[in-house]
Amino acid sequence: MDIVKVCPELHIVMDVDSGLIAEMRKDILVVDLHPVEDEINKLAQYAKALENSLDPRNSPMKAYNGREGTYKLAGMFQGMFFGFWVTMAILVLVTILAVKMNLSLIGL
């Protein structure tokens, strides 16, 4: 919101956006909210990107074209990775338990 002082001696100003001419008062503070609105729009864009990241079919916000399904692929590999290590831990525990129960398996 821009204002122009039409007559500084009489404290008369004009609003550039609306063309309204009015008396300038000292008890009213005029604040430009365009920077705040820009920040709110940026936060809304980030919120939309976060919401889209919950759907594995969407691509990340600043990804190159053709990156749809990145989250789906990452989720699949994450499940395979942790599944492998959990299976290996269970296998080691079963092996240790089997050896403890029957020591003849290792020749003792």
UniProtKB/Swiss-Prot annotation:
Pfam families: MtrB (PF05440). It catalyses: 5-methyl-5,6,7,8-tetrahydromethanopterin + coenzyme M + 2 Na(+)(in) = 5,6,7,8-tetrahydromethanopterin + methyl-coenzyme M + 2 Na(+)(out). It is found in: Cell membrane. InterPro entries: MtrB_MeTrfase. It is a single-pass membrane protein. It comes from the Archaea. GO terms for molecular function: tetrahydromethanopterin S-methyltransferase activity. GO terms for biological process: methanogenesis, from carbon dioxide; methylation; one-carbon metabolic process. Pathway: One-carbon metabolism; methanogenesis from CO(2); methyl-coenzyme M from 5,10-methylene-5,6,7,8-tetrahydromethanopterin: step 2/2. The keyword Translocase applies. It is an enzyme of class 7 (translocase). Its EC number is 7.2.1.4. One of its GO terms (cellular component) is plasma membrane. Keywords: Cell membrane, Membrane, Methanogenesis, Methyltransferase, One-carbon metabolism, Transferase, Translocase, Transmembrane, Transmembrane helix. The chain crosses the membrane at residues 79-99. The complex is composed of 8 subunits; MtrA, MtrB, MtrC, MtrD, MtrE, MtrF, MtrG and MtrH. Belongs to the MtrB family. Part of a complex that catalyzes the formation of methyl-coenzyme M and tetrahydromethanopterin from coenzyme M and methyl-tetrahydromethanopterin. This is an energy-conserving, sodium-ion translocating step. NCBIfam families: methano_MtrB, PRK00965.1. This is Tetrahydromethanopterin S-methyltransferase subunit B. It comes from Methanococcus maripaludis (strain C7 / ATCC BAA-1331).
